[in-house]
Amino acid sequence: MGLLSALKDFKVHNMSLKTLFKTLKKQIKYQKKIIQDNQRVKRIKRKDKIKVGFFVLHHSVWKSDPVFKAMLEDDYFEPFIFICPVNNIEDNQAIEDIKTNVSFFEKKGYPVVSSYDENSSNWVDIDSLGIDLIFFSNPHKLTKKEYYAKAYSKYLSVYIPYAHQVSKYNNYKSQYNQDFHNMMWAIYAPHFDDMDIFKEYAIQKGKNVIVTGYPSMEPLLEDNQPNESPWKQQENTKRKVIFAPHHTIDTPELPYSTFIKFSDVIKELSEKHKDDIQWAFKPHPLLKEKLYHHTDWGKEKTDEYYDYWKNSQHCQLEEGDYYDLFKSSDAMIHDSGSFLAEYLYVKKPVLYLSLSEDIRNYQNAFGNKAYDCCTKGHSEKDINQFISEVIDGTAKVDNTFLENDILVHFADKTPTQKIISHIKEKLMDSPN
């Protein structure tokens, strides 16, 4: 018995030594990056103007628009969009997707560069672009290493999360403690709970984190009137409801999705209430591809489902910008991650779908504060009741989260102003 106990103690001790060695190795790596970044800052300070590349995977998750616009109007910055390919799809499809995304930003009048050079049929070497600072919006290995790890290792890099940081999974490693996070020159966090998590779980302990608030949401607070209506014209006035399902149909470590259970229910309800409600189907960009490979769905069934929302007179499919959609809507039904916080900015009724109350275990403190202000939906009965309340105007709205956890970040300066100020303070020789 004593021998077994000794062996167990040795194993635990040995494992802890391995963990310690691994952590020390990473700390040395991160400290080296800090030293290199300090040298980069010194070089950049000699410049009157800096070139800033915003690395983007898809326009649907473009969340740095206010910051980009501010840089366009500031003589110190020369910003441009750099469209990266997405991994795990054929090159031909990746190139077509890049073209679509380039077109999106060109229509906005933004300077944009494709990562694929059609003239040479080669991927662009970012060293040829003269970049001083890179903005990332996704911490995961979703693109070529040249536009991910090699880029943030070699260039001064900052990170604005593409989501509002409401989730909790994998002991926070994926969201807060990858090499990516620890090697950023600066991380612009959307809320104070984010800073607490970085301090506890990241090897850098939040030393490179600045809490600014979430710049992506500025348009929702600046003006609550839509620039133009994104909704299909109807014969009579109807309530406008958004149905926004998440993509995690195959992700047990983050079981947000209720789509498999409720997709047909909500489709049937949209038919039942078509004289009273017009619907916007706003799926997560990754949902369709996952449904294509789902054993109970597949491409044909998925396309038919999407086409229903796209082509029905009382429905529409929304796959891009959603600011005007949020502003002009009357309510939302969803099981999303970031939308859990984002839709609460517009002070409208929201039904959050989940399969059980255990969902709280997959949200951080910030996410749970947002969740507490939502109407909860666990069944078809709950969905029916919410829809009835939306139609008759009795659906409840709770603004506690907005007032306590959001508006504080917009009190004196906007998140964009804080980000611009931080960069200029650190990189300009004599900032104004």
Show where each model-derived region lies.
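Nucleotide-sugar donor-binding patch of glycosyltransferase catalytic domains
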Residues: 300, 345-393
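C-terminal amphipathic helix plus adjacent low-complexity
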Residues: 380-381, 385-432
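Active-site and donor-binding regions of nucleotide-sugar-utilizing enzymes
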Residues: 53-221
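Conserved catalytic-core segment of nucleotide-activated headgroup transferases in glycan assembly
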Residues: 63-73, 215-302, 410-417
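Membrane-proximal basic amphipathic "stem/tether" segments
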Residues: 1-48
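A donor-sugar binding/catalytic signature common to diverse glycosyltransferases
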Residues: 158-159, 318-362
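A nucleotide-sugar donor-handling region in carbohydrate enzymes
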Residues: 19-37, 161, 174-257
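Nucleotide-activated donor-binding/catalytic signature segment of Leloir-type glycosyltransferases, i.e.
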Residues: 294-318
